[in-house]
Regions:
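Intrinsically disordered, low-complexity segments
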Residues: 1-4, 10, 260-263, 267
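Charged, amphipathic alpha-helical regulatory modules used
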Residues: 3, 8-122
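Conserved catalytic cores of very large enzyme subunits
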Residues: 108, 114-550
C-alpha cells in the first residue's frame, strides 16, 4: 500500500496516512497537512539562489522530509528544521537562503506580535514605561499617542534593520542601553548649550521670519523660550542655557534705562519742559550703566541734566531712580514668571512635547544678574497656577563658586543665624552667598535648583578670571539630561555652544554581579578579602572590555 502525497510522491508502505497528519502552528492552532507548502517554500529558496526548473529535486527533498514524520502531529518549526537538514545534504547554498528567509519571517512575525502588544498599550493609555517615559510629553493626548506610535515603530525599525547585530543583541540582553533609538534614523543631535548672548546680538531666524535684538527683560525672557521652542524641532534631546543670569542681565539694564527715561520724561513734562524723549534716552544709556548707580554716577547724571537745561534736584533724581528700580524689579519678576510658565505650557515638538529645558546660573555678581537670580527663585517658589504647582521645567542648576557664591567664613556666619530668613538678611564676603542661601531655601520647597560645584578639580578651568565680564565661558554648565560637556579634544575647554550625540549606558551593576560570581568560583577558599580583590579586578577588566565594545 502507498500514500499518495502528490502526483510526484510515492512513499513507502510503512508511511502513515498523510490525511491524518495535523500541523500545529505557532499560535497553537491546528490545520491539515499540505505537502505543497513545503514544496513552495523549498522552491522559493531555489529561485533565490538562482536555480530554476529543479522540480524533481524539490519534490525529492519534500519526500525525504515527509519520511521523517513519526507522529500524527508535528509543529511548523519541526518541519522547517527537517527542511534545513535535507537541504544541507544536497544544496548547502539553497539551505542558507532558506535559513535566511526563515529568520526574516520569524523577525517579521515577532515584530508584529510585539508591536501589536505595544500599540494596544498606547491605545489603552496603560500606565507603563512606554507611556510614562517622557516627563515633557503627555501620552494621553491624541498628539502624544501619535508621537508614541511613531517612536515605538521607529525604535523597532532601528533595532532590527539599522543597528549592527552585536549591538542590537547587547541592547536586547540588557548589557548596554542605547538611548534615543527612535531618533537614530534621523541623524540629529541630542542636547545643546546655547550662547544666548550671540543669538540675541546677531538675531536669528525662525521658519516664518527673523528675530532682532530684544530691548527689555520681558523680550529677553520671551525670546529665550522661542529659541528653545524653535530648536526643539531641529534635534531630539534637551536644551540648556549655560549662563542664564549673565545673558538676562542686559535685558534688566535695558528695562531700567527705559523706566528711567519714561519716568524722567514724564516728570520734566509735568514741570513744563519740552522733552525730546529720544535725547533723554541717549543720555540715560550713556551715563546709567547699572541699575544701582553709585552716588558719584548719580551726581554726574544730575550735572548733565542741569547742563541740558533741566532743573532737577538731588532728591527728585533719587526718587525717579528708585521708582525706575522698583518698576524694573516688577518687570523682571513678571518676565521670570512668564519664562517658567511658558516652558511648562508651550508645546513644540510634534505639537505635544514641552521643551526639555535647563538653565545654569549663580555667578553673575552684577546688580542686574543678581536681580535675575533673585526674581527667578521667587517665581519658582510661587509655582504655577493658583495652587502654586511645582514647575518641572526649566531644570535649574545653581553654580557654586568659592569667593563668588560661597566661602567657609560666610557659611560659618550663616550657621549662627536662627533661621535661613534671618541669615539671608545679613551681609557676606562672597557677593552671591545670600542668593545661595535663597537657592537652598527654594530647593527645599520646589525641588530646584540643583547645585554644581565649580571648584571641584575636574570642574575647574585655568582661564577663569573674576575680572573677566565673560568668565561664564570658562564655567562648567550641565544640561537637564545630566550631561556634562566641558573638556574638548579639538578646541577650547568650555560648555558654551557645546552639545552631544545620543549616548549608550553600560550596565555596570550586572558587570559587578557577574564579576563577584566569577571571583567566588575562582577563589576556592573562604577568604573574603581575596574574593573581593579578584571581583574588583574582574569588574574593571569587564568595564574596559565593554567600553571598547561600545
Amino acid at each position: 500500500m502507498t500514500c499518495n502525497v502528490s502526483p510526484f510522491f510515492n512513499l513507502s508502505m510503512n508511511c502513515m496516512n498523510l490525511n491524518e497528519i495535523c500541523i500545529i502552528k505557532r499560535d497553537g492552532k491546528r490545520e491539515n497537512f499540505s505537502a505543497a507548502k513545503i514544496t513552495n517554500a523549498i522552491g522559493k529558496a531555489f529561485v533565490a539562489t538562482g536555480l530554476e526548473h529543479q522540480e524533481a529535486m524539490i519534490n525529492e527533498i519534500t519526500q525525504r522530509v515527509i519520511e521523517h514524520f513519526a507522529e500524527p502531529t508535528i509543529t511548523v518549526e519541526a518541519i522547517q528544521d527537517l527542511v534545513e537538514t535535507e537541504l544541507m545534504k544536497v544544496q548547502p547554498e539553497v539551505a542558507k537562503k532558506y535559513i535566511i528567509y526563515r529568520q526574516w519571517r520569524n523577525t517579521e512575525r515577532d515584530r508584529k506580535t510585539q508591536i501589536k502588544h505595544i500599540m494596544d498599550g498606547i491605545v489603552a493609555i496603560d500606565k507603563n514605561d512606554i507611556n510614562l517615559s517622557n516627563a515633557n510629553m503627555s501620552s494621553h493626548t491624541p498628539a502624544g499617542q501619535m508621537m508614541t506610535f511613531a517612536s515605538e515603530i521607529t525604535k523597532d525599525y532601528t533595532y532590527k534593520y539599522l543597528l549592527p547585530k552585536k549591538y542590537a543583541e547587547a541592547h536586547q540582553l540588557g548589557d548596554i542601553h542605547i538611548h534615543d533609538l527612535d531618533y537614530y534614523p534621523t541623524k540629529t543631535t541630542t542636547c545643546i548649550q546655547y550662547d544666548l548672548d550671540d543669538l540675541f546680538e546677531r538675531g536669528f531666524h525662525t521658519k516664518n521670519g527673523s528675530i532682532r535684538t530684544p530691548q527689555s527683560i520681558q523680550s529677553y525672557a520671551t525670546l529665550a523660550t522661542i529659541i528653545f521652542q524653535t530648536n526643539q524641532n531641529e534635534q531630539h534631546g534637551g536644551q540648556a542655557i549655560p549662563a542664564f543670569d549673565f545673558f538676562m542681565a542686559k535685558g534688566v539694564l535695558k528695562s531700567y534705562q527705559k523706566a528711567v527715561t519714561s519716568i524722567l520724561s514724564f516728570f520734566l513734562e509735568m514741570k513744563g519742559y519740552n522733552v525730546a524723549e529720544n535725547d533723554v534716552q541717549k543720555t540715560v544709556n550713556q551715563q546709567l550703566t547699572t541699575i544701582i548707580p553709585s552716588a558719584e554716577i548719580q551726581k554726574e547724571f544730575l550735572t548733565t541734566l542741569n547742563k541740558e537745561g533741566f532743573n532737577v534736584n538731588e532728591d527728585e533724581l533719587k526718587h525717579i531712580l528708585n521708582k525706575a528700580y522698583e518698576r524694573t524689579r516688577k518687570d523682571t519678576h513678571q518676565a521670570m514668571e512668564g519664562f517658567i510658565h511658558n516652558l511648562n505650557t508651550m508645546h513644540s515638538r510634534g505639537g505635544n512635547q514641552v521643551v526639555f529645558s535647563s538653565i545654569n546660573y549663580g555667578t553673575d555678581t552684577s546688580a542686574e544678574g543678581r536681580m535675575v537670580i533673585d526674581e527667578l527663585l521667587k517665581a519658582t517658589i510661587e509655582g504655577l497656577g493658583t495652587r502654586g504647582e511645582v514647575p518641572v521645567f526649566p531644570i535649574q542648576i545653581f553654580k557654586v563658586k568659592d569667593g563668588v557664591s560661597y566661602s567657609e567664613k560666610d557659611f560659618e556666619k550663616a550657621m549662627k543665624a536662627e533661621n535661613i530668613e534671618e541669615a539671608m538678611k545679613d551681609s557676606y564676603e562672597a557677593p552671591n552667598f545670600d542668593l545661595l542661601l535663597k537657592a537652598c531655601q527654594t530647593t527645599a520647597k520646589a525641588l530646584f535648583p540643583n547645585f554644581m560645584f565649580l571648584d571641584t578639580p575636574f570642574n575647574q578651568n585655568e582661564k577663569w578670571d573674576i575680572n573677566d565680564p565673560k568668565r561664564y565661558k570658562y564655567e562648567l554648565a550641565t544640561m537637564g539630561c545630566r550631561t556634562r560637556v566641558f573638556e574638548n579634544l579639538n578646541g577650547e575647554k568650555t560648555s558654551l555652544g557645546r552639545g552631544n550625540l545620543s549616548f549608550t549606558t553600560m550596565n555596570m551593576p550586572r558587570l559587578a554581579i557577574e564579576a563577584r560570581i566569577k571571583a567566588e568560583n575562582i577563589i576556592e577558599s573562604n577568604n573574603s578579602d581575596a574574593i573581593e580583590q579578584e571581583a574588583c579586578n574582574l569588574f574593571l577588566e569587564s568595564v574596559r572590555e565593554m567600553s571598547r565594545f561600545i
